[in-house]
Amino acid sequence: MTADTEPVTIGALTRADAQRCAELEAQLFVGDDPWPPAAFNRELASPHNHYVGARSGGTLVGYAGISRLGRTPPFEYEVHTIGVDPAYQGRGIGRRLLRELLDFARGGVVYLEVRTDNDAALALYRSVGFQRVGLRRRYYRVSGADAYTMRRDSGDPS
C-alpha cells in the first residue's frame, strides 16, 4: 500500500512517540515555539491529560491532546495541541483526532486557542460547535501571532 491508500488508525499516544511528535511540531509550528520531546513526555505523564495518535503504516502522522481542568465535576477541558503531518493534511485526520478528544470530554465545556490566521483549523473547530469567545494578542511568543480563544459548550451534540 502507498501512503495514499494505507489506512490511518487512531490510538493512544505513548512516551515512545514523543520524539516523532516533536519532529512534527517542528514542521507544523515553524517560527513559533514547537514543543520538544520533553514537553510531550511531561504532557503524557499527567493523569489529567488524554493524548491520541494517528498512524499510517506504523508511522505516527498526527497527534492530539486535551487536559481535564479542576479536581471535581463539572469538569472543563482544554485542547492542548493537534497536529497532522503536512503530507497527510486534508484527509480528515485532524477531524478524527479532535473527535477522540471531544469524546473524552463528553459532558464538559471545552476550550482551545488557535492562531487567528489558521483558516483550516478555524473551519474545523466551528464545524464541531466551537465559537470564538476571545482574542489573545501575541499569544504565540516567538512569532507574536494572535490567537482566538474558542469554546464548545457541553451540550453541543456535534
Curated annotation (Swiss-Prot):
Coiled coil ranges (UniProt) are none
- EC? 2.3.1.255, 2.3.1.258
Top-level EC class: transferase
What domain of life does the native source organism fall in? Bacteria
- Output the PROSITE patterns linked to this UniProt entry: GNAT
- Which BP terms from GO are recorded? N-terminal protein amino acid acetylation
Question: Taking every annotated instance into account, which residue ranges of this chain make up the domain N-acetyltransferase?
Answer: 8-155
GO molecular function per UniProt: protein N-terminal-methionine acetyltransferase activity; protein N-terminal-serine acetyltransferase activity; protein-N-terminal amino-acid acetyltransferase activity; protein-N-terminal-alanine acetyltransferase activity
Q: Which reactions appear under catalytic activity for this entry? A: N-terminal L-methionyl-L-alanyl-[protein] + acetyl-CoA = N-terminal N(alpha)-acetyl-L-methionyl-L-alanyl-[protein] + CoA + H(+); N-terminal L-methionyl-L-seryl-[protein] + acetyl-CoA = N-terminal N(alpha)-acetyl-L-methionyl-L-seryl-[protein] + CoA + H(+); N-terminal L-methionyl-L-valyl-[protein] + acetyl-CoA = N-terminal N(alpha)-acetyl-L-methionyl-L-valyl-[protein] + CoA + H(+); N-terminal L-methionyl-L-threonyl-[protein] + acetyl-CoA = N-terminal N(alpha)-acetyl-L-methionyl-L-threonyl-[protein] + CoA + H(+)
Q: Which UniProt keywords apply?
A: Acyltransferase, Transferase
The record describes its quaternary structure and partners as:
Monomer. Interacts with TsaD. Interacts with GroS/GroES.
Q: Which NCBIfam families match?
A: rimI
Instruction: Outline what the protein does.
Output: N-alpha-acetyltransferase that specifically mediates the acetylation of N-terminal residues. Able to mediate acetylation of a wide variety of N-terminal residues, with preference for hydrophobic N-termini. Acetylates GroS/GroES and GroEL1. Able to acetylate the ribosomal protein bS18, but it is unclear whether it acetylates its N-terminal alanine residue.
Q: What is stated as this protein's family in its record?
A: Belongs to the acetyltransferase family. RimI subfamily.
Name assigned to this protein: N-alpha-acetyltransferase RimI
Native organism is Mycobacterium tuberculosis (strain ATCC 25618 / H37Rv)
Q: What is the lineage of its organism?
A: Bacteria, Bacillati, Actinomycetota, Actinomycetes, Mycobacteriales
